[in-house]
Curated annotation (Swiss-Prot):
The keyword Transmembrane helix does not apply. SUPFAM superfamilies: Acetyl-CoA synthetase-like. This is Medium-chain acyl-CoA ligase ACSF2, mitochondrial. GO terms for cellular component: mitochondrion. ATP binds at T263, S264, G265, T266, T267, G268, S269, P270, K271, D493, R508, K599. One of its GO terms (molecular function) is medium-chain fatty acid-CoA ligase activity. It is an enzyme of class 6 (ligase). The keyword Ligase applies. It is found in: Mitochondrion. GO terms for biological process: fatty acid metabolic process. Gene3D superfamilies: 3.30.300.30, N-terminal domain of ligase-like. It comes from the Eukaryota.
Length: 615
């Protein structure tokens, strides 16, 4: 029987007084622990010689295990690439006029890592990075990994209450940020919850509300109570501190925690998904392999990244994947800007582009879109939320992204677990989120019976493998709720799987509408409404109803300049979808309630609609 690779034994994570993980994370390679009743596991030979397919008519699939998982730390991966292609351009930050080769980037990262240790930070300490995309963000991402410090990805839009919550939750010892960006005054926001910073000695902060926070680092301006990032890097430039860094690295393990990614909070308070070097290195490596980066020339390895670095897609699929494959990471702007993204593609001869559906819509809708030279584009990734089929086709045909990959994942899974192959058809890319990634298992469970769902039958998607997080920082109970005894992570997403192993996300289990006993999945209806020529965007929610339990409400945003009526929309539905799926309520809206990271909060939309409809 084949050996199962990549099973993580979850330790309980707790942020006690020592601030370290409450239990060591071990790697289990036992088939006995991977038992799945009623399913015969594929041997490694069977898995490796074919595209991974479901087994026995049931919604279970195991990814290819032909290539070994990588046991290097992030720092070791940077060292390897810097030695292999030292003169190749590694990082371009257009809005800061920064250009670094891999050799130069490694040198700066080593100095920054050494500097962080020199000011008193230690392995396992948490450092929050709070700000938009910048050179400092990439530097801190790599320097913390090099030093064994855990990077906490802090949403740059956080206000005082949100900032206090995440810093307390993980016990941040250090916080790095710019003075301001647009109207976001970072230092002033911090002072609302930490007024002591104004009179503190740099590196010696003592805060009543943030007792763990001792060090505040300003990226770009001298501020009271803070260290300048340039000073920290300079402090790490001495031979003594660089030698100390090198000595410390022998105690780093690929299974050490490296990053805390906060979930977006669409259903409650954010949780800190904790990821290891092992999670991040292997996920980025496998995504690059799925994109076939190993087959590209250096000229074709130029990635435009408008996605935020505080998201997993940006930090893992962007920074880390470029590092693994010697690709050039190009940051077009501090926050997403469709025009700047197009300018970066044209000016920097970009070949790959990452983004969410909203970003791609904005890029395609730029008034001067046709004036940009996008001839060098060949592929990229769309992820973050469901994308309607017509958008997929527009990206492939209009942005020249023939090798577009639709990817699916969650922060808890490092993040990508399903993605297309570049050669998959437009129809396959438009109708699914692709096939299982290597060294990953997926199953879809019947939510009522608790058994494996048959193919093409909706159920909750569960994931197992190397990619599953270490846990939610400081929340062992929520970790146990999310990851069961057999190490299956419950995504909360409702999905189907077909005979070829393609996965389609139907909706969120919490968003499922039960109308008179019928299960209705909002994503299915949203896909349908996107075929209406006047509809720009639509969100479907369930609203309370005394007789049916729930009724369907479609919240439709029309394209600019378009007009229609409720009656016309309902007439469009007749004969095309089942009568019980036709929304009882249709409301035309101009926007949706969003999290600060831009995700639609359906529970708030539901509340708004129930008030609007006087239910």
């Amino acid at each position: 029987m084949a050996v199962y690779v990549g099973m993580l034994r979850l330790g309980r994570l707790c942020a006690g007084s020592s601030g370290v993980l409450g239990a060591r994370v071990a790697l289990s390679r036992s088939w006995q622990e991977a038992r799945l009743q009623g399913v015969r596991f594929l041997s490694s030979r069977e898995v490796d010689r074919m595209v991974s397919l479901p087994i026995g008519g049931l919604s279970y699939v195991q990814g290819c295990t032909k290539k070994h998982l990588n046991s290097k730390t992030v720092g070791q991966c940077l060292d390897t690439t810097a030695q292999r292609v030292p003169e190749r351009e590694a990082l371009v930050v257009l809005h800061e006029d920064v250009r670094l080769t891999f050799g130069q980037l490694k040198e700066e990262v080593d100095k920054a890592a050494s500097g962080l240790l020199s000011i008193g930070l230690c392995k396992g300490d948490r450092l929050g990075m709070w700000g938009p995309n910048s050179y400092a963000w990439v530097l801190m991402q790599l320097a913390t990994a090099q030093a064994g410090i855990i990077l906490v990805s802090v949403n740059p839009a956080y206000q005082a209450m949100e900032l206090e919550y995440v810093l307390k939750k993980v016990g941040c010892k250090a916080l790095v940020f710019p003075k301001q960006f647009k109207t976001q005054q970072y230092y002033n926001i911090l002072k609302q919850i930490c007024p002591e910073v104004d009179n503190a000695q740099p590196g010696g902060l003592k805060s009543q509300r943030l007792p763990d926070l001792t060090t505040v680092i300003s990226v770009d301006a001298p501020l009271p109570g803070t260290l300048l990032l340039d000073e920290v890097v300079a402090a790490g430039s001495t031979r003594q501190h660089l030698d100390q860094l090198q000595y410390n690295q022998q105690f780093l393990s690929c299974h050490d925690p490296i990053n805390i990614q906060f979930t977006s909070g669409t259903t409650g308070s954010p949780k800190g998904a904790t990821l290891s070097h092992y999670n991040i290195v292997n996920n980025s490596n496998m995504l690059g392999e799925r994109l076939k980066l190993h087959e590209k020339t250096p000229e074709q390895l130029r990635m435009i990244l408008p996605s935020p670095l505080y998201h997993c897609l940006g930090s893992v699929g962007g920074t880390m994947m470029c590092l693994m494959y010697g690709a050039t990471l190009i940051l077009a702007s501090p926050v997403f800007n469709g025009k700047k993204a197009l300018e970066a593609i044209s000016r920097e001869r970009g070949s790959f582009l990452y983004g969410t559906p909203t970003m791609f819509v904005d890029i395609l809708n730029q008034p001067d879109f046709s004036s940009y030279d996008i001839s060098t584009m060949c592929g990229g990734v769309i992820a973050g939320s469901p994308a309607p089929p017509e958008l997929i086709r527009a990206i492939i045909n209009k942005i020249n992204m023939k090798d577009l990959v639709v990817a699916y994942g969650t922060p808890e899974n490092s993040p990508v677990t399903f993605a297309h192959f570049p050669e998959d058809t437009v129809e396959q890319k438009a109708e699914s989120v692709g096939r299982i990634m290597p060294h990953t298992e997926a199953r879809i469970m019947n939510m009522e019976a608790g058994t494996l769902a048959e193919l093409n039958t909706p159920g909750e998607l569960c994931i197992r493998g190397y990619c599953v997080m270490l846990g939610y920082w400081g929340e062992p109970q929520k970790t146990e709720e999310a990851v069961d005894q057999d190490k299956w992570y419950r995504t909360g997403d409702v999905a189907t799987m077909n005979e070829q192993g393609f996965c389609k996300i139907v909706g969120r289990s919490k968003d499922m509408i039960i109308r008179g006993g019928e299960n209705i999945y909002p994503a299915e209806l949203e896909d349908f409404f996107h075929t209406h020529p006047k509809v720009q965007e639509v969100q479907v929610v369930g609203v309370k109803d005394d007789r049916m339990g729930e009724e369907i409400c479609a919240c439709i945003r029309l394209k600019d300049g378009e007009e229609t009526t409720v009656e016309e929309i309902k007439a469009f539905c007749k004969g095309k979808i089942s009568h019980f799926k036709i929304p009882r309520y249709i409301v035309f809206v101009t926007n949706y309630p969003l999290t600060i990271s831009g995700k639609i909060q359906k529970f708030k939309l539901r509340e708004q609609m129930e008030r609007h409809l006087n239910l």
